[in-house]
Amino acid sequence: MYSEQNPARHYIALTFVWLLLGAALGLHFPDVDTRFQWLISPRLLLHRSAVTHGLIVPSLLFLSARAKDKAPSFRSFVIGFSLASAVHLCFDFFPKGWVGFALIHVPLYGRTTALFSQAWIMLGVLACLYLAFLLARRLIELAFGAGILAASFIVSAAENAGSVLNALTLLIVAGVAVVTARRFRKAASEIIR
């Protein structure tokens, strides 16, 4: 039951729930075309679409969360969604071969090359992690975000046993790159001031 005497506990619980909800959706959103193929026309969305497998949807959610300074619940949802999407993309970066459905599909263009597909997925991983990091305003969001990232990885590892070590390595390297870029950006902005 909600206690007016302890709103911090209520905030923490809501933050966790919204992060978890965002992660649950973000972890499987890139494959929405295969899960709802009976609902979505293949002319609109094919597997590994650039629309779902990359930075487009997380970026739109990020802009929406920042533009209107929405409630912390929406911000938490977007953080969870972005982190889980990054995990999904880390596993998608290691297909059995860069041919056919492993390649990114651009609507109205078709399948791209292996190099473009790899670059697009890598850019998506970095963008998703960076956007989540930018949205986190409180230490509790960073702490829960780290937990959500780990939980998303565990769920994906159970579903994709073949490339666990590679995906983990990619996630760690991308995470270090994002933290380094954020610190560099912060230091550069302080020098400019």
What annotation goes with each model-predicted range?
Residues M1-R193:
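N-terminal membrane-targeting hydrophobic helices
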